[in-house]
Amino acid sequence: MLVARESLAEHYKEVEAFQTARAKSARRLSKIIAAVAAIAILGNVAQAFAIATMVPLSRLVPVYLWIRPDGTVDSEVSISRLPATQEEAVVNASLWEYVRLRESYDADTAQYAYDLVSNFSAPTVRQDYQQFFNYPNPSSPQVILGKRGRVEVEHIASNDVTPSTQQIRYKRTLVVDGKMPVVSTWTATVRYEKVTSLPGRLRLTNPAGLVVTSYQTSEDTVSNVGQGAP
């Protein structure tokens, strides 16, 4: 578009005013966008904080179930809140499982038993057990039996010696390929503590939250299969 010379000054003023207005509009729009973004960020932060305070950290909680005399089923999430007979049953079952896996042996399930007994034990008890079971200890069932035999154990009785100590009698049967099984009876003395800070993965196999702090076992009798065991 041609502009007459006498109108150039006026035209330049109009162009300058237009550019100035556009610049102001752009700056104003940028400020509005920045304000909206800041509000959105603050809103997201507030929402995240609200969710974090309303939703507790997830953790694995064992639920204990038992059948009442009338046939109804009841449950509890804390072993300390169980009826006395039910709490005792959970502790007895957990301690027997520990003794059973520690004293029995089968090559196919040896790794599972080793891991559970280790996780169930206090550091000194765990160290003693692992030194006994691992190579190259000549007394380890891995060395003596390997895949040629197995050790089976059966529960006889459990008796509380003190509130945190239990004696468990069990029958032990040594089975070796090509030989007659040997049956013996043993007594394990287990001292334990109840803890509440076990990781969730350990609660799956140790719902009572027990840690064995001392473990001893002694042989009572030995007999061959076919003869009466005391």
UniProtKB/Swiss-Prot annotation:
Family: Belongs to the virB8 family.
Periplasmic side: 62-230
Keywords: Cell inner membrane, Cell membrane, Crown gall tumor, Membrane, Plasmid, Transmembrane, Transmembrane helix
Bridged cysteine pairs (disulfide): none
GO cellular component, one term: plasma membrane
Transmembrane segments: 39-61
Protein name, as recorded: Protein virB8
Side of membrane Cytoplasmic, spans: 1-38
Subcellular location field: Cell inner membrane
InterPro entries per UniProt: NTF2-like_dom_sf, VirB8
Membrane topology category: Single-pass membrane protein
Species assigned in the record: Agrobacterium tumefaciens (strain 15955)
Its job: VirB proteins are suggested to act at the bacterial surface and there play an important role in directing T-DNA transfer to plant cells.
Protein's UniProt keywords contain Cell membrane: yes
